[in-house]
Each structure stands twice: as structure tokens, then as C-alpha cells.
Amino acid sequence: MLVNFSKMHGLGNDFLVLDNVTQNVFLSPEQITKFANRNFGVGFDQLLVVEPPYDPDLDFHYRIYNADGSEVGQCGNGARCFAKFVRMKGLCNKHKIKVSTSTGKMNLHIERDGNISVTMPVPQFEPKKIPFTAQKTEGTYILRSESETVLCGAVSMGNPHCVVTVDSVAEADVESLGKELSVHERFPEDANVGFMEIVSPNYIKLRVYERGAAETLACGSGACAAVVIGYMQKKLAKQVTVELPGGKLRIFWQGPGHPVKMSGPATHVFDGQISI
């Protein structure tokens, strides 16, 4: 069976996108891992699947799978690519698109300049909602890894995030420490780990180790998490430019109880077919 797909990326965070509205495709975790391989497959950070909506008030259901085959509840960069894909493929002609994920709902808006803004979920700080093991909600937690003890913030953006403030992202041990913290026992579902360098209240540099993957060139939900944690720690303003290895995102947050707005580009690379 031949399956049509698109290869896309958001600031270098790359995706294989499947239309499951006009196709009927199921990929096992083993198949996803096979196709994610950059030497023997297509190569991608995550698989995005477009499905018909489960709610008549929504336009689509949005599913996300990591390169290891595990399903996750959120991907901000993927959401921008999702919006561009459904417009490009004629699945939707709206500028404002409403979708559900396994953990909530999102609004996607295609802007006049071609960028796409995503209304992300309201950040969740309560430990059991992240999930994170702690007796109470705090702005900063102490995490002890095998190599060192770090101070971090914890939040859910529809997926769990750990944010560590560093003096320099260039010198941060993203690969080793990021992997340790990602699978730390206090994150029962693992976590994405962001290393944040604060340049000014309106500008940060960020590198992210994604759970189930590794360091990526960009992470939209990670950018949102970093800004939210920085704001709650009274280090950042409401509107922040986030510089990632793959490019820049604009993040805006009004504070607790409000959703986070993220704006940035989405790029179509090529279309292809895979045999399953």
C-alpha cells in the first residue's frame, strides 16, 4: 500500500505529515521508528496526522507521534505546519482553524505575512497536571540528577516541560543533562527540557532536549514553556522573542489563566509516497 505524505519543518524542527482525512492509514510504533530514521527512512523529529474532527465545532483532530513511536499531546511547531498543510492540500480554506489534540484544543491562525500563530493551551502549574512529583506548586524546584543538582521550573503546555536557566546556552550540556532530566523520576511521563539564557526581559536564547527524541533545532511548546516560567519567576515580560538554533519565534502571554500565543513560520519541503 502506497501512502502519500508531506515533509515539512518549523524552524528546522521537521515532520512527516499524513492526511488521514482522505486516506486511512495506521502506522505501528515500529513503522514510525523505521520511517523516522534519517539513514534508512524518510527522517523526521515527529509524525503529524490530520484526522477528521471528533467535535462538530472543530475542523480537525491533530495527532503527534515522537520518533520513537510514542504518542504525545502537543507540538507547537507541528501545529503551524499542520495549519499550512490543511490549507495547501485543500482540506480547509479557512484562515482560522480549530483543532483538538489528545490533551486539549487549539486555534491556528494563518496571518497575512504567511506566518502562523497558534493559541496554545493555558499553562498548567499544578504538579499532578504536568505531571510532576511535588508536594505543592512552586516557582522553582530542585532536581538532583546523576551528574549535578539543578534549579528548574515545571509546567505543562499540553505536554510536560522542565525549564533550566543557564548563563550561556552555547555552553549548556543539553545532550547529557537534558537526557538525564528528561527521564527524571519526578516526571512520570518524561519531559521536554529547555535550557534558557535570558538576554533581556523581551529576548531569550533557548535550546531544547525533546523527550523521546533528542535536541531539536526548535520546539514551539518549549519556547512557550520557557517564556511562561521566566514570566512567573519575574524575569521576563509578556511579549518575548525566543531565539532557537533554527530561528526565532514570538511568544505572548498575559499571565496565569490565559492561553499562550506563539507566532512563527512553517515550511513545506516536499511531497512523497511510502510503502507500508
Curated annotation (Swiss-Prot):
The active site is at residues 75, 219. Disulfide bonds: none annotated. The record marks 270 as: Important for dimerization. Keywords: Amino-acid biosynthesis, Cytoplasm, Isomerase, Lysine biosynthesis. It is an enzyme of class 5 (isomerase). Its EC number is 5.1.1.7. It is found in: Cytoplasm. It comes from the Bacteria. Pathway: Amino-acid biosynthesis; L-lysine biosynthesis via DAP pathway; DL-2,6-diaminopimelate from LL-2,6-diaminopimelate: step 1/1. Belongs to the diaminopimelate epimerase family. This is Diaminopimelate epimerase. It comes from Colwellia psychrerythraea (strain 34H / ATCC BAA-681). The gene is dapF.
